[in-house]
């Protein structure tokens, strides 16, 4: 008979217990051991508990048990956890810290990674999945972590690489934390606001008046329109500053905010596409804010795939989609950033916005150079273009947007549209899936 030491404190058990509300962690598969002699406990701790009162399932790879080496039993424990999480409609959090496959097991450990990947793939879009990378995450573990909806890394501790540690760059984390406790706090924050599963919704009582007027500029617009100025940004370090994504409550309803503020890049478009896809999976309304002149001037043709993914994301999403042009929406920036033509349910523009195929400067240079005279300056022609061709009323008259509003009305109009669309039901033609670009 084996010795009774399931409550031995290890690095993995410490991490998983500290993640949950105090006293709520319940371990599953605690007695599972590896090897023929059965002397070593498996290098992953699994269990469930409460996060701000919500059920969640967590596995933590245990660096104190054979450095968290991955084998068939490791995958079996994780599969047990995933089966329970999906049946109960609760999110999964994975704490990654493993040296990799247990090489003594040969192909069995390699097949175990396939089992792990299948668990993550089948749960994708069913329950939220968040990876916290607190230590080593290499090779196929890095592939699995990238399959999660969002990953949280820790400065100075996360070691993410495919083949050699000196190539550890380029991983797109949703959040980069200063330390492990902040990483856990960020994961708990996300779990507390997100729906528990794809049949759930997320609402929050608020005292922030839906009808309050707002004042904003392009730097603080998000904080001005969301409830209590509380915006949880994700993927901040991916794709540049010109594309911002994150979660907030607007009128008590959870929304995914996508904000294009500057020249669009392929990486920024890819980030927005992933975020919109997540929101669509869990019925989270997407609010798009637009202030862009379109493509960045120095992009290569390879960026087209990122923009193609963005187009797919908007056109295939059936969740409520609301777009507001708050500055410029020029050329491809208008079309790709949640326009009505790619599926927005409601789109409006503030009075001072500009919607046009070209900027005023380019329009005059390409189309009106011959009209520049001593009496008609380039500047006056550009002003005429903005007034006559880029005026949002022109777009409204053509049915490209639904309304032109005062900027002070932005929050109340967003709230009204969100409430109207809260019971939206839309179906798409039957198919397996879209064929995404590479």
Task: Pin down the residues of each PLM region.
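Ligand-binding clefts of soluble mixed alpha/beta catalytic domains
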Residues: 1-438
């Amino acid at each position: 008979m084996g010795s009774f030491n399931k409550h031995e404190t290890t690095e993995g058990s410490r991490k998983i217990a500290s993640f949950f509300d105090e006293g709520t962690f319940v371990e599953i598969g605690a007695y599972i051991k590896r090897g023929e002699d059965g002397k070593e406990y498996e290098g992953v701790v699994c269990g469930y508990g409460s996060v701000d009162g919500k059920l969640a399932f967590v596995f933590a790879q245990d660096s104190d048990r054979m450095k968290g080496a991955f084998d068939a039993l490791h995958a079996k424990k994780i599969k047990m956890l995933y089966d329970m999480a999906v049946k109960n409609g609760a999110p999964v959090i994975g704490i990654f810290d493993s040296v990799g496959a247990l090489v003594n097991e040969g192909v069995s450990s390699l097949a175990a990674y396939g089992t792990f990947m299948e668990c993550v793939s089948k749960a994708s879009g069913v329950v939220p999945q968040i990876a916290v990378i607190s230590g080593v995450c290499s090779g196929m573990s890095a592939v699995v972590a990238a399959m999660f909806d969002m990953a949280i890394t820790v400065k100075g501790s996360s070691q993410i690489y495919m083949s050699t540690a000196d190539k550890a760059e380029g991983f797109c984390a949703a959040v980069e934390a200063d330390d492990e406790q902040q990483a856990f706090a960020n994961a708990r924050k996300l779990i507390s606001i997100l729906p528990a599963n794809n049949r759930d919704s997320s609402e929050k009582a608020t005292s922030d008046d839906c009808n309050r007027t707002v004042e904003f500029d392009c730097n603080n617009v998000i904080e001005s329109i969301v409830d209590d100025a509380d915006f949880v940004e994700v993927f901040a370090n991916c794709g540049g500053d010109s594309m911002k994504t994150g979660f907030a409550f607007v009128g008590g309803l959870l929304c995914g905010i996508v904000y294009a503020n500057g020249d669009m890049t392929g990486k920024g478009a890819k980030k927005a596409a992933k975020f919109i896809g997540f929101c669509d999976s869990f019925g989270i309304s997407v609010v798009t804010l637009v202030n862009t002149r379109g493509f960045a001037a120095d992009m290569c043709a390879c960026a087209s795939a990122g923009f193609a993914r963005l187009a797919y994301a908007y056109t295939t999403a059936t969740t409520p989609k609301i777009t507001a042009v708050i500055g410029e929406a020029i050329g491809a920036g208008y079309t790709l950033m949640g326009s009505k033509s790619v599926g927005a349910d409601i789109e409006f523009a503030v009075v001072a916005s500009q919607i046009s195929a070209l900027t005023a400067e380019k329009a005059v240079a390409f189309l009106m150079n011959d009209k520049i005279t001593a009496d008609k300056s380039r500047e006056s022609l550009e002003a005429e273009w903005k007034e006559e061709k880029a005026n949002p009323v022109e777009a409204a008259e053509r049915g490209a947007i639904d309304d032109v509003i005062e900027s002070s009305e932005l929050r109340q109009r967003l709230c009204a549209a969100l409430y109207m669309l809260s019971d939206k039901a839309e179906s798409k033609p039957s198919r397996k899936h879209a064929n995404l670009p590479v």
